[in-house]
Amino acid sequence: MLSLDYNNIFIYELLTERFSSENPSSIDQVVTDFDGVTFHISTPEEKTKILISLSMKCYPELVNYGTLDLLKQIYGAYVHEPEMGYNFSILIDLQQLPATDEEKEQLAMSISMLKRNVLAAPFHRAFTKQAELADLARKDPENAPMLDKQATSQELMAIHYRDEETIVLWPEHDRVTVVFSTKFREETDRIFGKVFLQEFVDARRRPAIQTAPQVLFSYRDPPLEIRDIQGIQKGDDFGFVTFVLFERHFTPQNREDCISHIQVFRNTLHFHIKASKAYMHQRMRKRVADFQKVLNRAKPDVELERKTATGRSFVRA
């Protein structure tokens, strides 16, 4: 199973090339990414100053969960006034780049992960709140169920990151739950989706990966905890995938990787659905071509009309 990259490869390669070039040139390119995200890379003032802007449907929601503070913490002095029509902008001065090639590469990678970092804030907030609830539960174990109930109602975060799809997450004293709602636009997609999701559920039975997050999925109706959220779609073409993350999954050492893996789940799922359909269509076309060859070989030879030199038809006696 393939894993999609967390960063935007086009932005990474473009910035890497510009950081190493001695002769900067003008840029004005619009780059699209998964989930309807749009980037605008331009040099509006000078060739040595690159402006990278991001437009994201759910950005106003994410600001409520601390995204702007997180982005300022990550990008620091590179944060710039947002370009008109975009939500967030970064300005890079090629004359004030880091000294070493390694630092330049890290900067290019960090900027190419802008979409990932924008979506990371709710996860950091949920992990921080979970730690607070865990401390309170250790002091008063009998009150843990009440703490979880309050957290589910007060700390539940919904991210409407696509037109009809939503990410919902909330902390409890011993876990963080993440729910993806996803739409299967075709009946074939729904069938393939069930197969893939069942593999996620069954995978934990293998001894080597029994410590993986628990995965649950359902169709038509969302889980009880999120049924009252405004904007949650439901129906025969909707599925709901739930990840249950325990403390061992988001320790300080692997927290960033956990966030990255969870974020790309939806796109990875649909990528593999489309790849599977393409593979089956390819195999079907090959099988049809093989059948056509067999039929062509089985055709009887057409007996041609023979004529004499004078033009009369020649009939075999």
Curated annotation (Swiss-Prot):
Q: Where in the cell is it found?
A: Cytoplasm, Cytoskeleton, Actin patch
The cellular component terms of Gene Ontology attached to this UniProt record, alphabetical and capped at eight, are:
actin cortical patch; Arp2/3 protein complex; cell division site; cell tip; cytosol; nucleus
Name the UniProt key words of this record, in alphabetical order.
Answer: Actin-binding, Cytoplasm, Cytoskeleton
InterPro entries for the chain: ARPC2, ARPC2/4
Q: Which GO terms describe its molecular function?
A: actin filament binding; structural constituent of cytoskeleton
* A GO BP entry: endocytosis
Task: Kindly give the Pfam families that the UniProt entry links to this protein.
Answer: P34-Arc
Answer whether the UniProt record assigns the keyword Cytoplasm to this protein: yes
Which Gene3D superfamilies does the entry mention? 3.30.1460.20
Q: Whom does it interact with, and what assembly results?
A: Component of the Arp2/3 complex composed of arp2, act2, arc1/p41-ARC, arc2/p34-ARC, arc3/p21-ARC, arc4/p20-ARC and arc5/p16-ARC.
> What family does the Swiss-Prot or TrEMBL record give for this protein?
Belongs to the ARPC2 family.
- Physiological role: Functions as actin-binding component of the Arp2/3 complex which is involved in regulation of actin polymerization and together with an activating nucleation-promoting factor (NPF) mediates the formation of branched actin networks. Seems to contact the mother actin filament.
Q: What is this protein called?
A: Actin-related protein 2/3 complex subunit 2
| Record gene name | arc2
